Amino acid sequence: MGISRYIITTRPEGKFKPMATECISIKNVPLTKIIKTGRQEEIIQDIIKNKPNAVVLTSSIGASEFFKYYYKYTEDPDIIAIGNNTADEIKKYRANVSVPTIRNSYGVIALLKKYLNSTIALFRSSESNNIINDWLEKNNINFREYHIYSVVKIESSEIKDLFLDTNCIGILLTSSMEARIFHDILSGIEITKNIYAIGNVTDETLRSYGYNVSFTGNSDFESIVKYIDSKNC
């Protein structure tokens, strides 16, 4: 017998992987898609010139693209992953990776404090938040930011009906961009269901629209889904 109650997740196309749950099912409805930029010669030349001592990777997609195109041009830098999923992708290519205790941008910053006199490279999306960048600039730390993929909005004709269905217990939004899209789609409708967020920036974006956020997790999609599942048994 299937599970009728469900949570909506909004992982981008290509990033969602089905996972086992006990008490609710998962319906993933992407609101964005990832566009990879491929090998960029200007990035390669900049890496060779600047020789980063530390590399920050904030997504599994970014990690995959980094190792596919750019890692060979570095000189064995330390690598920091924002969360477990990103770290798992990195470990396909090398064993040593640092993961912050608090798996978000502020946790990454805590690890970067030992690289004050180093060159740091950020490999990420063109839509990433500026929390890490702002801290690096404020502390006059030499860093380079490389955009190796982008995230664009896609039209969803089903998310509104799925969210308003009585079997839906709520939604898990994984980025501030998804939060903005969700607000545009549901604007003017009173929300009484649970809204969950991944990351402080997503949480802050939702609250800026007047939504109550039931729970905010760090950069670990599977862990927060398991938490939501356990709370609905």
Task: Mark where each language-model region is.
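Signature of uroporphyrinogen-III synthase
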Residues: 1-233
